Amino acid sequence: MPDDGRAAGHVSGLQVAQANGLVEARYRFDLTGYARAVDERTTVLQRGSGVLSLLSGWLLEPRGYDRAPTIDIRMTTGPGLVFATGLPKVGDAWRLSGTTIRFAGYTALGRLNLQEIAVPLPGSLRPGQPQGQGVLRVAILDGVSTVGQAELLDWVRRTAEAETHYWQGFTARQMLLGLVPVGTRRGVGYGRTVLGGGPTVMVEVGAAVDPR
């Protein structure tokens, strides 16, 4: 079962098969049902048809190893749907290595606004250092107007630029920032960072955006 025990009731059709030294598990997971039942900003939240959830909430984890195994995640999404994490991309897979699923951070799934912002690699703006680009993925869940989403993205870009100039490069090679609208809030509210296999950040923002 996924690491969060509350997820067990949302797993169905679990089948485990062994062949040629490999074990394959197939199952269905009701992500919307899980999000509605838990609805915690530290675990999983849903706005419209988009979900921000810890990877440990819905992904099965191999057990019985002396050290955490490397896990490659390949995701196929339907038309208009997206998937993103803070994990590095290796070919067509998102790779988790050196840590367990419990510390893998947030994932963004479903119908939401996903944008990628190119950022300089950590330390790459220092004299004599090799140049390179990383990526800041920004996932905005439903609840903010189109104009408001543009204002939020501009705010994120300007903040990332300020951090880049201060640290002479961005603070991570890749990062996922999930922005979760809260109708009762003004401005920026609660935020949470999960490092692990790839840094992810969840920030609650007011549904009404004030560009000031």
Where are these regions (language model features)?
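A surface-exposed beta-strand-loop module
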Residues: 1-43
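Solvent-exposed beta-hairpin/edge-strand motifs
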Residues: 1-11, 70-89
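Extracytoplasmic
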Residues: 9-11, 20-22, 68-70, 133, ...
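C-terminal beta-strand-rich structural cap/linker in extracellular carbohydrate-active enzymes
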Residues: 17-28, 93-116
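Zn2+-dependent metallopeptidase catalytic core
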Residues: 26, 30, 59, 68-84, ...
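Glycine/proline-rich low-complexity spacer/linker segments in large multi-domain proteins
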Residues: 30-68
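Edge strands and adjacent loops of beta-rich recognition modules
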Residues: 45-57, 100-132
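Juxtacatalytic substrate-recognition/specificity segment
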Residues: 120-212
